[in-house]
Amino acid sequence: VYLQLFILEKEINLLMNLDEHWYVLLTIRSKEEEVCKYLIENEGIFAFSPKMEFYHRVSKQIQLRTLFGGYVFVVSKLSQVEVDRIFRKFPLESVFIHELKYKEDISALTDEEIRILTMLMDDKKILRMSYGVLLNNKIHVTRGPLVNMDDYIIKYDKHNRLATLNLNFLNQIWKVGVTLIE
């Protein structure tokens, strides 16, 4: 019941923000935060590079890394023309940015992709570690953002504690952190 209420709350928040437009920028890997910093300085723009928690074997700690390397997500109530103007004024010539679009004027993110992204990430735009157990050689998530998404897990790497998800998102394969509870 709690999960259903949580999903419903996220859906309502998404519907309340229908006047927001989502954009996807492609940039150089490792320059995502630099691009976000510039974009956030512009009024009416929220930019982020999603992160994910993962288990680092050497340090034996949960750490953060970029979920989609080279991608920056922008949310704004500004029009496409206004946002394009801000993108074109990007001051750092050494950092390449390119807006991804399906067609001339259609953002590269579908409503379904936006819904998935907002459901899985927390308010800090981090996909938190999930926890689960093995049942019949298949992982069953009991805690975390992947609860009730067992059917989307197509592979589990026990050694690195990473699950591969069968989600269509920017033609990327989702590898997310899942730790087995012993």
List each language-model region with its residue ranges.
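Acidic-enriched and Gly/Ser
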Residues: Y2, L8-L135, K155, T164-E182
